[in-house]
Amino acid sequence: DYVVAGFISLEEDTSKFIVNYFLFDIRQGRNLLNGTARSSADSLVLSSHKMSNRIYKQITGAEGIFTTKLMYILNPEKDKYQLNICDINGDNEITLFDSPEPIMSPDWSPDGKKISYVSFENGNSEIFIQDLSSGKRNSLRRYPGINSAPVWSPNGNYLAFVSSRSGNPDVYLYDLKTEKISRITAHYGIDTEPSFSANGRKLLFTSNRSGTPQLYEVSLITRKISRITFDGNYNARGRYFPDGKNIVFVLSLIH
């Protein structure tokens, strides 16, 4: 339905590359986008990613992901774990943290300046927040038992996470400004995998309080909890769509 074409030339006096590109709608028979980018050789890939973002948004209406970063965990050899980031195409790989003990559950802050993750470096699961510019790491306090699944609120002011500090895995909320921790769920079942709604007023989480893993929603205003899924014996890892109207999750219908 669309054709993307581009032409590249070199400015001899500046050694800059000039890229002219356009997006053509075949069905409508018209140009949708014309663009020009001027770039050095070192930043040519970044410029192409920015062009891809413009083209993607023109076609879909959504923001492109081509200038974003990937964050992932590697276990290249025994007793070696790495938390890395790289460009969307795999280039410019950087190791943010490495440890002889497992690393789990990395998550970006909304502004992309910090990350959270779980590390077992001190013999127990412990949640850390790391500043990407300075590399400074702070622990979310050390408690025995389970400390896992940290996720950032949309405004970057809170972390939801799971802890068994009271004897059973429940969902907690950490205020990054006051450093106050609030307990959100209190049940003898296992509550885990919290996820914020787009407006930050609700949390989706997985619980086996009904006997099998199912998705539940809790209001952070009223603390009212509602069961979301009923079909199947395994529904987990729920995440809200950005529009707040739908969720995506893992479902198993095998009995």
Mark where each language-model region is.
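Amphipathic beta-strand/beta-sheet edge segments enriched in Tyr/Trp
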Residues: 1-52
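Structural motif
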Residues: 14-18, 78-84, 124-128, 168-172, ...
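Residue-level detector of Asp-centered blade-edge/turn motifs that repeat once per structural unit
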Residues: 64-66, 110-111, 154-155, 198-199, ...
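Hydrophobic beta-strand positions that form the internal "hydrophobic ladder"
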Residues: 70, 115-116, 156-160, 200-204, ...
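Multi-bladed beta-propeller domains
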Residues: 87-102, 130-148, 174-190, 218-234
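Conserved small/polar residues in nucleotide/adenosyl-binding loops
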Residues: 254-255
